[in-house]
Amino acid sequence: MGNVQERPSETIDRERKRLVETLQADSGLLLDALVARGVLTGPEYEALDALPDAERRVRRLLLLVQSKGEAACQELLRCAQQTVRMPDPAWDWQHVGPGYRNRSYDPSCPGHWTPEAPSSGTTCPELPRASEQEEVGGPEGSEALQPRTPEEPELEAEATEGDEPDLEQEMNPEQEPEPEPEPEPEPEPEPEPEPEPEPEPEPEPEPEPDFQEEDESEDS
């Protein structure tokens, strides 16, 4: 007798513990994949997604899928393998191979946004192309294309008014500037008068001798 191939439901029974432990972290992504493949219906998805416990959510999911038949179990195992291993390196650009960036876009589902091909050559109409910038003359040309603000003419007018006296001096270099008037000297303060010395007291006159008394003495 040859080896009999194991059915998907038997694989789930054998690896139930490992599946529950492995799929707890990514149970939400697994539910999304099963809904997209038509394994789960909308009400079933909402009922499982509302469970707060991740372990309980995965256990209920395995039982529900096993009740749907071998085809549903096979889709579950395929989605679980893709969810856990993540073979597409789109989320890790450090390990992207050389051909991944140049791969062609896969046909999208109807109703979804389709990215434009890299070779379309469409550019934003508001941004100038590199060739247009070279024709203008690089950054200098871009400055020349910028509109001037109304404040610039006023600044230029003030600058021309301030330069007129300098131009007149350059045109008449022989004209000497007028000498500035010398400041008048301040008057010197008058010296204060010296105080007059006090007059010395006059000596009292000596009394004159009484000549009459002398005459009387001589007569006697």
Swiss-Prot record:
<dbReference type="GO" id="GO:1901222">
    <property type="term" value="P:regulation of non-canonical NF-kappaB signal transduction"/>
</dbReference>
<dbReference type="GO" id="GO:0035877">
    <property type="term" value="F:death effector domain binding"/>
</dbReference>
<dbReference type="GO" id="GO:2001237">
    <property type="term" value="P:negative regulation of extrinsic apoptotic signaling pathway"/>
</dbReference>
<comment type="subunit">
    <text>Oligomerizes (via CARD doamin). Interacts (via CARD domain) with CASP2; inhibits CASP2 activity in a phosphorylation-dependent manner. Interacts with CASP8; decreases CASP8 activity in a mitochondria localization- and phosphorylation-dependent manner and this interaction is dissociated by calcium. Interacts with TFPT; translocates NOL3 into the nucleus and negatively regulated TFPT-induced cell death.</text>
</comment>
<dbReference type="GO" id="GO:0016528">
    <property type="term" value="C:sarcoplasm"/>
</dbReference>
<dbReference type="InterPro" id="IPR001315">
    <property type="entry name" value="CARD"/>
</dbReference>
<dbReference type="GO" id="GO:0062099">
    <property type="term" value="P:negative regulation of programmed necrotic cell death"/>
</dbReference>
<dbReference type="GO" id="GO:0014736">
    <property type="term" value="P:negative regulation of muscle atrophy"/>
</dbReference>
<feature type="lipid moiety-binding region" description="N-myristoyl glycine">
    <location>
        <position position="2"/>
    </location>
</feature>
<dbReference type="GO" id="GO:0001974">
    <property type="term" value="P:blood vessel remodeling"/>
</dbReference>
<dbReference type="GO" id="GO:0005730">
    <property type="term" value="C:nucleolus"/>
</dbReference>
<dbReference type="GO" id="GO:0043027">
    <property type="term" value="F:cysteine-type endopeptidase inhibitor activity involved in apoptotic process"/>
</dbReference>
<feature type="compositionally biased region" description="Acidic residues">
    <location>
        <begin position="152"/>
        <end position="220"/>
    </location>
</feature>
<keyword id="KW-0963">Cytoplasm</keyword>
<dbReference type="GO" id="GO:0089720">
    <property type="term" value="F:caspase binding"/>
</dbReference>
<protein>
    <recommendedName>
        <fullName>Nucleolar protein 3</fullName>
    </recommendedName>
</protein>
<dbReference type="GO" id="GO:0005739">
    <property type="term" value="C:mitochondrion"/>
</dbReference>
<keyword id="KW-0472">Membrane</keyword>
<dbReference type="GO" id="GO:0043066">
    <property type="term" value="P:negative regulation of apoptotic process"/>
</dbReference>
<dbReference type="GO" id="GO:0010804">
    <property type="term" value="P:negative regulation of tumor necrosis factor-mediated signaling pathway"/>
</dbReference>
<dbReference type="GO" id="GO:1903298">
    <property type="term" value="P:negative regulation of hypoxia-induced intrinsic apoptotic signaling pathway"/>
</dbReference>
<dbReference type="GO" id="GO:0010468">
    <property type="term" value="P:regulation of gene expression"/>
</dbReference>
<dbReference type="GO" id="GO:0014808">
    <property type="term" value="P:release of sequestered calcium ion into cytosol by sarcoplasmic reticulum"/>
</dbReference>
<dbReference type="GO" id="GO:0002931">
    <property type="term" value="P:response to ischemia"/>
</dbReference>
<dbReference type="GO" id="GO:0005509">
    <property type="term" value="F:calcium ion binding"/>
</dbReference>
<feature type="modified residue" description="Phosphothreonine; by CK2">
    <location>
        <position position="149"/>
    </location>
</feature>
<dbReference type="GO" id="GO:0016020">
    <property type="term" value="C:membrane"/>
</dbReference>
<feature type="region of interest" description="Essential for interaction with BAX">
    <location>
        <begin position="20"/>
        <end position="70"/>
    </location>
</feature>
<keyword id="KW-0449">Lipoprotein</keyword>
<dbReference type="GO" id="GO:0016529">
    <property type="term" value="C:sarcoplasmic reticulum"/>
</dbReference>
<dbReference type="GO" id="GO:0097193">
    <property type="term" value="P:intrinsic apoptotic signaling pathway"/>
</dbReference>
<comment type="function">
    <text>Apoptosis repressor that blocks multiple modes of cell death. Inhibits extrinsic apoptotic pathways through two different ways. Firstly by interacting with FAS and FADD upon FAS activation blocking death-inducing signaling complex (DISC) assembly. Secondly by interacting with CASP8 in a mitochondria localization- and phosphorylation-dependent manner, limiting the amount of soluble CASP8 available for DISC-mediated activation.</text>
</comment>
<dbReference type="GO" id="GO:0005123">
    <property type="term" value="F:death receptor binding"/>
</dbReference>
<dbReference type="GO" id="GO:0006376">
    <property type="term" value="P:mRNA splice site recognition"/>
</dbReference>
<dbReference type="GO" id="GO:0010667">
    <property type="term" value="P:negative regulation of cardiac muscle cell apoptotic process"/>
</dbReference>
<feature type="region of interest" description="Disordered">
    <location>
        <begin position="111"/>
        <end position="220"/>
    </location>
</feature>
<keyword id="KW-0597">Phosphoprotein</keyword>
<dbReference type="GO" id="GO:1902109">
    <property type="term" value="P:negative regulation of mitochondrial membrane permeability involved in apoptotic process"/>
</dbReference>
<keyword id="KW-0479">Metal-binding</keyword>
<keyword id="KW-0703">Sarcoplasmic reticulum</keyword>
<dbReference type="GO" id="GO:1902176">
    <property type="term" value="P:negative regulation of oxidative stress-induced intrinsic apoptotic signaling pathway"/>
</dbReference>
<dbReference type="InterPro" id="IPR052685">
    <property type="entry name" value="Apoptosis_Repressor_CARD"/>
</dbReference>
